[in-house]
Amino acid sequence: FLLILLRLRAPRQGLGGSWKGGLALFLYAWLFSVAYVQLGAGVGALVLFGAVQMTMFLYAWIRGERFSGRVMGGMLMAFAGLVLLLLPGAAAPPLASSLVMALAGVAWGAYSLLGKGSLRPLADTAGNFLFSLPLLLLLAAGLVVGDGPVVGTSGVLYALASGVLASGAGYAVWYGVVRQVSAQQAATMQLSVPVIASLGGVWLLGETLSLRLLVASVVVLGGVGLALSARRV
């Protein structure tokens, strides 16, 4: 799909991307898929993008970007929201799946940071997908050799729709946006996703919006708002 778009928009433009982008994309998609087997839509999104935020803020700090007390307070508040969500208890999500989702968030944070230097979002996204293909084929071969999952027609159609629209086109758009904002802005922008995912889970999947998830979401988004309201120093 991306190759077709690339040929239509820029017939003479070659593919971009890198093996680093392909690796980050593969790890994100694989870990994300494994983790969501046992996590609800809202919980998974909150853990995922909380990890994304921490990854990108840490990168910005290592690169020499200094933050005000308000930004640091917002980061700590958002992190506290994630801790609140994962505290042991009857309403706590599975810890192993949550940790896998956090690793997926680190991979997506790395993928987003790699996109900050992208001047050709569509070409780079298409190239990154191609670079991830060998790893995907190895994973598919492993599933075939082992006791692979049963694949139905509806599952294939959902996967195609997700890959073409949400992943292919969506990632290209994100690469076009992320290069125009700072690392901390990119990180905080993405934390609106858990709220959307939670509402979608309740509306489309019949999931229950627990009090713990609701409170954790408010704390995380409050931290994001606090961080965004501060000026960089």
Residue positions per predicted region:
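Transmembrane alpha-helical segments that form core, pore/gating elements
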Residues: 1-5, 55-57, 90-146, 173
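Juxtamembrane helix-entry segments on the extracytoplasmic side of multipass membrane proteins
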Residues: 14-15, 87-107, 142-161, 208-218
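Helix-helix packing/entry segments at the starts of transmembrane helices
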Residues: 44-51, 114-134, 167-203
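Hydrophobic transmembrane alpha-helices of multi-pass small-molecule transporters
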Residues: 1-6, 29, 53-60, 82, ...
